[in-house]
């Protein structure tokens, strides 16, 4: 793990690259006489010779339907799930097992799908025990998916109940945080590599894609997908 979180790494990469980082969302991608015009959510228009679209699969079709319909159609076939993460800081000295966590099978009476004992997995920070519980599974409806339908207070209550059930822990957390990832967990079903090949094949030469829905959801796989995307655009520029 990166000390201070991945934000530290991103900030340092931006600093060393000497680039301008505009923290806006792109809402439209259009062809331009010499490349592409990208419109952000503040209405500003950006000109680009080439672009890497590093967005979740559900966002991709709305950006490129008009310029890469084959890619848009392939992206729509990638199913996704939503999840809510509950991070708790428990008082130090709580008797937790020396394991990294627990995966919960569907059908169990726990609401959590996974419990990560963060202090055991990544090392302790201060006099607290950090734990993380995940809620929401692929296949949940919009009404039953915890990430979409449950409030923060409900999630915190479920987390306390699940910790008590699994570990016998009944304490008030020192601190807590709830974060939701909506439609952000791509599902790798049968034939996924062929689907990704079709998705990439439909892109214009100076557009590329990157993200966890392509070649794997882990950090190394995402870095590799981004490197591949950037390299393809460099090659396209050289070919021109």
Predicted regions and their residues:
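Generic solvent-exposed, charged/amphipathic alpha-helical segments
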Residues: 10-15, 61, 65, 156-164
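A conserved beta-strand/loop element that lines the FAD pocket in flavoprotein oxidoreductases
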Residues: 16-28
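Mid-domain catalytic core of redox enzymes
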Residues: 27-148, 153, 165-166
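Short glycine-/acidic-enriched loop or helix-start segments at secondary-structure transitions
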Residues: 25, 62-64, 188, 219-220
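A structural signal for the hydrophobic beta-strands that form the central parallel beta-sheet
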Residues: 21-22, 53, 209
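Short, well-ordered alpha-helix to beta-strand connector turns
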Residues: 17, 48-49, 204
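Conserved flavin/dinucleotide-binding core of flavoenzymes
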Residues: 114-240
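Short beta-strand to alpha-helix junction loop
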Residues: 1-14, 21, 147-154
């Amino acid at each position: 793990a990166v000390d201070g979180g991945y934000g530290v790494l991103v900030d340092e990469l931006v600093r060393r690259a000497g680039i301008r980082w505009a923290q806006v969302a792109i809402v439209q991608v259009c062809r331009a006489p010499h490349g592409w015009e990208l419109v952000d959510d503040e209405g500003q228009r950006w000109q680009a010779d080439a672009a890497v679209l590093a967005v979740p699969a559900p966002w991709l079709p709305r950006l490129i339907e008009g310029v890469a319909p084959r890619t848009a159609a392939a992206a729509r076939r990638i199913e996704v799930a939503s999840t809510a993460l509950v991070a708790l800081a428990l008082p130090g000295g709580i008797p937790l097992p020396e394991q990294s966590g627990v995966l919960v099978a569907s059908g169990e009476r726990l609401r959590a799908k996974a419990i990560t004992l963060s202090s055991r997995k990544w090392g302790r920070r201060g006099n607290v025990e950090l734990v993380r519980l995940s809620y929401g599974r692929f296949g949940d409806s919009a009404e039953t998916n915890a990430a979409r339908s449950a409030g923060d207070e409900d999630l915190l209550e479920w987390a306390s109940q699940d910790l008590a059930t699994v570990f016998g822990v009944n304490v008030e957390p020192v601190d807590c945080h709830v974060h939701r990832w909506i439609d952000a967990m791509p599902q790798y079903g049968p034939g996924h590599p062929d689907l990704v090949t079709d998705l990439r094949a439909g892109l214009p030469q100076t557009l590329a894609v990157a993200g966890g829905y392509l070649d794997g959801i882990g950090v190394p796989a995402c870095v590799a997908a981004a490197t591949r995307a950037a390299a393809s655009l460099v090659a396209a520029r050289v070919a021109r």
